[in-house]
């Protein structure tokens, strides 16, 4: 593995470079944490013909136990089809790569603080954000991005094992 140069350029509305920076990354740097590539298995649900020019969407399991991964995959497929049932996604379906990340929790469901229910799930999600009963979020973003470490993604959809509608 060789050192690589990362260049970032910021453009204005006229496509002129306003600012730029370069950074070199040595893969053997002691501050780069090695991860277990098999920590969270994933399944490609839809593969576009041109993977270099597609939008990568990752469905991430939250509150599904290892025994419930079949249910998670079914829920992911159902959510994927629901997205593609609507314009403009219907006609652009071949531009999307969809992956389901099987991040198993030890317990099923999600926390509901207003009901006194706190669960230790893989992403630590919970309802009642900002005291809104349907507002579901997680503060454990590092865990979320660690679960996605070996999966290319542009957009993240966390599927929570609950029948209650929520989002955040």
Label every PLM stretch briefly.
Residues 1-51:
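Extended acidic/polar, glycine-enriched regions
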Residues 6-13, 21-23, 72, 84, ...:
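Aromatic-enriched hydrophobic runs in primary sequence
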Residues 26-27, 65, 134, 140:
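Helix N-terminus capping/helix-initiation residues
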Residues 32-85, 100-112, 142-145, 150-151, ...:
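Fold-level signature of zinc-dependent metallopeptidase catalytic domains
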